[in-house]
């Protein structure tokens, strides 16, 4: 949902995920990294569904297991919609410093009309930014809280539409979650609050995102 205010205790989660053999870090400087020039740069933009279990690091590690070197940066706040990110300058600052190949964007479930509108408007604006910077926009399809499981089809449709309308790459994580849960009645992709992902759920997300990017 769109934020109404930014509590002083909130902060941007902007970090780089890479294997220690791939980069040298200065511990006194957040995000100061000398990257392997062969690494594929990936920017994640989202909220707690992205930073729970450190999804960017899981993607980095999964890619490395497939002999692909990537370097991820993340901009994420609790409860942020894409339009919240666009109202600030963190994205443009990140793009001014790094040539990203992929920009992976994530909003909440967005199953209802208002969330759908925010998702499509945000994706449209971010697509323009991605195009301007020579990057491919990727829509990370999430999932609803289990208490709203009946809204899952709306989540899938609205993310699919957002990707289609913006000619972006769809990362159909939510679709895979639903297929698995419907088939097995196993809720282990969900964490204890039955909304945020478990480590298993985040690992599945990383693998699906990888397949979507590197078909």
Give residue spans per PLM region.
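Bacterial N-terminal signal peptides
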Residues: 7-16
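Short, well-ordered coil/turn elements that cap or connect secondary structure elements
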Residues: 37, 65-67, 132, 165
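Alpha-helical cap/lid subdomain in secreted, periplasmic
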Residues: 92-199, 203, 207, 211
């Amino acid at each position: 949902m769109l934020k109404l205010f930014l509590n002083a205790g909130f902060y941007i989660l902007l970090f780089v995920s890479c294997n220690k053999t791939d980069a040298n870090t200065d511990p006194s400087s957040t995000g100061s990294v000398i990257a392997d020039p062969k690494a594929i740069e990936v920017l994640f933009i989202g909220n707690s569904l992205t930073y729970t279990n450190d999804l960017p690091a899981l993607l980095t590690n999964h890619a490395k297991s497939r002999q692909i070197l990537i370097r991820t940066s993340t901009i994420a706040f609790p409860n942020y919609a894409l339009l919240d990110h666009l109202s600030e300058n963190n994205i443009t600052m990140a793009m001014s410093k790094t040539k990203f190949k992929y920009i992976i964007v994530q909003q909440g479930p967005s199953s209802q009309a208002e969330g759908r509108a925010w998702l499509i408007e945000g994706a449209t604006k971010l697509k323009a930014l991605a195009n301007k910077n020579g990057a491919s926009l990727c829509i990370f399809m999430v999932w609803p809280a289990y208490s709203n499981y009946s809204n899952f089809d709306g989540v899938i449709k609205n993310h699919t539409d957002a990707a289609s309308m913006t000619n972006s790459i769809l990362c159909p994580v939510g679709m895979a979650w639903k297929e698995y849960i419907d088939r097995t009645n196993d809720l282990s992709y969900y964490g204890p609050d039955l909304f945020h992902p478990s480590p298993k759920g985040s690992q599945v997300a990383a693998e699906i995102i990888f397949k979507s990017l590197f078909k």
